């Protein structure tokens, strides 16, 4: 869960919206988790991608594959068991990945630092 929390916090730091974490482990062999978020611009999408990569690099975890960075509308980041989708709001609504994976368990990630 540390890796998931790191990714969610990195997205939140760059003001990504509607961050959803889906446990897909019982539904597919593609991975264990999807993390999906919305951004308002290409610049914000790239900022989120860069921040996720930076924070994961700090944990010595490298992105296995990345698609869509140049376009900036929808970037997929593959961390093996965690797949991150950083999308503009329009394609997110159109493709509705959450509905496609409706049987997945939604995970709540607490990003507050308790003292």
Give residue spans per PLM region.
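Polybasic/polar functional segments that serve as interface/processing modules
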Residues: 1-30, 39-75, 89-93, 100-115
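Active-site beta-strand termini and strand-to-loop segments that position acidic
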Residues: 77-79
């Amino acid at each position: 869960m540390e890796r998931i929390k790191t990714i969610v916090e990195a997205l939140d730091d760059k003001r990504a919206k509607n961050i959803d974490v889906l446990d897909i482990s019982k539904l597919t062999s593609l991975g264990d988790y999807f993390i999906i978020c919305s951004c308002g611009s290409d610049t914000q999408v790239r900022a989120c991608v860069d921040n996720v990569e930076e924070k994961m690099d700090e944990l010595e975890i490298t992105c296995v594959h990345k698609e869509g960075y140049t376009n900036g509308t929808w970037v997929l980041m593959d961390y093996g068991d965690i797949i991150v989708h950083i999308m503009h709001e329009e394609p997110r609504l159109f493709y509705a990945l959450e509905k496609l994976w409706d049987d997945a368990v939604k995970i709540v990630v607490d990003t507050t630092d308790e003292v």
